[in-house]
A protein has these predicted regions:
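Leucine-rich solenoid repeat scaffolds
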Residues: 210-253
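Eukaryotic tandem repeat interaction scaffolds
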Residues: 131-147, 152-181
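Ankyrin repeat boundary/linker residues
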Residues: 2-3, 35-36, 87, 99, ...
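Start-of-repeat signature of ankyrin repeats
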Residues: 6, 38, 90, 102, ...
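Ankyrin repeat domain, specifically the short helix-to-loop turn at the C-terminus of the second helix
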Residues: 23-31, 74-82, 119-127, 162-173, ...
Length: 254
């Protein structure tokens, strides 16, 4: 039952993409901020809109009704949802190395490179500069930080590039470093996105900042050359080449 799982009827309706039903529940007084599992409806929309959960490739729920997810998001905020609410427990988003705690809906929309939702959230008053508990920025997350399965996680390279451009247009710091030593360039390397690597370089990502080991000893180049993911070593030769092309312009002193 819903009570046994900790789910509310509103969360169950959203989780099945029954947004019209969810809208009726709001009209009947459902709490738009109830988060019995550590995440609220405003967060849940981010992984319902862009499924393809890392490592599972599950399809999105089919849903029903005449109300779409963006229209419902507006209704949710109009009904009193805290648009900058932060996740307190890890949500069911599949394999991901990203610390979801402290994440807002905007940061989680950046995780799936969902620019339409990112724009709507900002239009509705979201703070696009809120970080997670590790001080990872939405820009880092948009670039690919937390990627669990390159090529399987939500967000194509083109979508990620658009999300990165949008985050930068909002004044995100391209040279920010989180408490684990990660940068946006680490994110692009983890997600194996050479075009994003090149774009971050073009936009002023400082080599002296990103060409450093993070807390687990990974530089962007090492990530691209190959790191352990489960039982396998996963690499990306095109991402490796993109990073080397940048490093070759700035040879180390002899």
């Amino acid at each position: 039952s819903a009570a046994q799982t900790g789910m509310t009827p509103l969360l169950l309706a959203i989780g099945s993409a029954h947004f019209e039903t969810a809208s009726v529940l709001l009209d009947l007084g459902a709490n738009p901020n109830a988060a019995p599992l550590g995440w609220a409806p405003i967060h849940q929309i981010t992984w319902i809109r862009k499924a393809g959960q890392a490592g599972s490739n599950n399809p999105a729920p089919q849903g029903s009704g005449k109300i779409g997810s963006l229209e419902f998001t507006k209704k949710l905020v109009e009904s009193g949802a805290d648009i900058n609410a932060k996740v307190t427990k890890r949500p069911p988003v599949g394999v991901s190395d990203l610390n979801m705690r402290g994440g807002t809906a905007f940061l989680l929309a950046a995780r799936t490179a969902d620019v339409d939702l990112m724009r709507l959230l900002v239009d509705l008053g979201a703070d696009p500069h809120e970080t997670n508990d590790d001080l990872s920025t939405p820009l880092m997350v948009a670039a690919g930080l937390g990627t669990g399965a390159p090529g399987e996680d939500p967000g194509t390279e083109e979508e990620v590039l658009e999300a990165v451009k949008y985050a930068l247009s909002l004044g995100e710091d391209i040279n920010a470093v989180d408490v684990l030593g990660n940068t946006a360039m680490h994110g692009a390397a983890y997600k194996h996105l050479p075009l994003v690597v090149a774009y971050l370089d073009e936009q002023g990502a400082e080599i002296s900042i990103w060409n450093q080991e993070n807390e687990i000893g990974h530089t962007p180049l090492l990530i691209a050359e190959g790191i352990h993911r489960g039982m396998n070593i996963v690499s990306s030769s095109v991402t490796e080449m993109a990073i080397k092309n940048i490093l070759d312009r700035f040879p180390l002193p002899q």
